[in-house]
């Protein structure tokens, strides 16, 4: 599968359909995989990797990448307008156009779709390719309970069939059904108990596929929200309720 992805990325680069590729880069060890941007076929051959350690969801990286692309376009348009104001005969300079290729696992495509709905990603700047889930190591209950096994919103698919029927995972809703069956007070106590385990490491915020704020409210020193351990149950609830509604 890795060879197929590299070959397709090279093809799109050589045809000029994309100018950059967002994928995964190998590190010193087999499991040392990090997201990376590739611009040439040589870089792809040297560092691109796709295996069971490619856990990172690449969709969030598109927020910054497409923003930079759109900023370059806006700057070029503004420069052309200002040039015309100085000299009505001035020739417009070309508006830069760039499309980035991104590989998305089935579950990642749902994050991609949500960010599109929130206008956090410019769709015209992205060529999305759906790829199969590699059954990532240590997926455990997370991958086993995943509801996003059917890729969506991609321009093409490699190794996955977007039309294939996926059997619903009914087991993942059993815990939800138990919580919904509780009384209001019972649900409150359940979540209070869950919140009490929080050490405010911010891992849930950082990994959340929909969290894309430039400045998080919980990084505001003026509001005393940067402290790690909540002093009261109210602070615990505040953090998680805001996280749930972001």
List PLM regions with ranges:
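Ferredoxin-type iron-sulfur electron-transfer modules in oxidoreductases and energy-metabolism complexes
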Residues: 173-196, 213-246
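Iron-sulfur cluster-binding cysteine motifs and their immediate structural context
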Residues: 148-159, 197-199, 203-224, 246
């Amino acid at each position: 599968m890795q060879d197929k992805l590299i070959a397709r990325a090279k093809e799109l680069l050589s045809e000029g359909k994309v100018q950059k590729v967002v994928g995964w880069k190998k590190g010193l060890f087999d499991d040392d995989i990090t997201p990376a941007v590739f611009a040439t076929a040589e870089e792809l051959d040297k560092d691109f990797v796709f295996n069971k350690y490619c856990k990172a969801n690449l969709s969030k990286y598109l927020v910054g990448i497409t923003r930079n692309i759109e900023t370059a376009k806006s700057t070029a348009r503004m420069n052309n307008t200002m040039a015309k104001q100085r000299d009505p005969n001035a020739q417009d300079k070309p508006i830069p156009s760039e499309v980035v290729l991104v590989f998305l696992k089935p579950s990642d495509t749902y994050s991609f779709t949500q960010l599109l709905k929130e206008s956090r990603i410019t769709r015209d700047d992205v060529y999305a390719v759906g790829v199969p889930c590699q059954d990532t190591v240590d997926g455990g209950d997370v991958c086993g309970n995943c509801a996003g096994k059917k890729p969506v919103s991609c321009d093409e698919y490699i190794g996955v069939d977007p039309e294939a029927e996926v059997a619903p995972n009914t087991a993942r809703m059993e815990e939800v059904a138990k919580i919904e069956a509780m009384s209001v007070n019972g649900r409150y106590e359940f979540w209070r108990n869950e919140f009490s385990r929080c050490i405010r490491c911010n891992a849930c915020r950082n990994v959340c596929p929909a969290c894309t704020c430039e400045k998080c409210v919980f990084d505001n020193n003026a509001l005393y929200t940067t402290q790690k351990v909540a002093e009261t149950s109210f602070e615990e609830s505040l953090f998680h309720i805001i996280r749930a509604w972001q």
